[in-house]
Amino acid sequence: MGNPQEAGRSALAVRIGAVFAFRETILILVLIVGGAIMTAASPVFLTWPNLEAILLGLSVEGPIVVGMAILLVSGGLDLSVGSTLAFTGVVCGLLTVAGTPAVIAIVLSLVAAMAVGMVNGLLIAKMKMNPFIITLGMMITVRGLLLIIAQGRAVLNLPASFTVIGQGKFLGVQYPIYVVIILTVVGDLLLRHTRFFRQNYY
């Protein structure tokens, strides 16, 4: 018969191994260690103003990361994302400066972004063209359109009805932070628990 003490140690080792088998566990540990190092280096790291600044920084790229995660797990590639993001922002800004209601301007700018994605999708999925070449070409094209539309200048004098979206607060937390958290949770739930999105893994 085996030694009960050795059997207990083996069972514990199996449990620990099972925990570290999840990539999420390793990522969480890396974040904890990184946070501990940054806190030791700077006492203000874990203060709310600093954490809010970090989350606000993530609120710009965060929604894009969620969409790109779905694309990448399906084996796709899109180099035009950054240019499309800038293009969408400029279109939305110019529309609001021209007097378009903020909600309508946001919808129209999202339609413009969807049009870019639709062209990419049709050329890649339907015409079987190389995604690297297509999205690289689209990146250059959108940058050119952006330069023409904005004429190389920043969009200024945005109305308060538009800027409140990025600067307004609820319970002391700015709106973009809520948006990125909600989108991240929704994206995670879709990838984990819906049949349509889980098919991207296979």
Model-based region annotation:
Residues 30-38, 180-187:
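Hydrophobic core of alpha-helical transmembrane segments in multi-pass integral membrane proteins
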Residues 100-139:
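Alpha-helical transmembrane segments within multi-pass membrane transporters and channels
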Residues 25-29, 54, 61, 83-87, ...:
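Hydrophobic alpha-helical transmembrane segments
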Residues 16-23, 48-57, 99-104, 165-177:
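Interfacial loop-to-helix junctions that mark the boundaries of transmembrane helices
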Residues 196-202:
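Short cytoplasmic-facing helical segments at TM-TM junctions of multi-pass membrane proteins
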Residues 32-98, 122-129:
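Single transmembrane alpha-helix segments in multi-pass membrane proteins
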Residues 127, 131-194:
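Transmembrane helix-bundle core of multi-pass membrane transporters
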Residues 1-26, 37, 46:
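Transmembrane alpha-helical segments of polytopic membrane transport and secretion proteins
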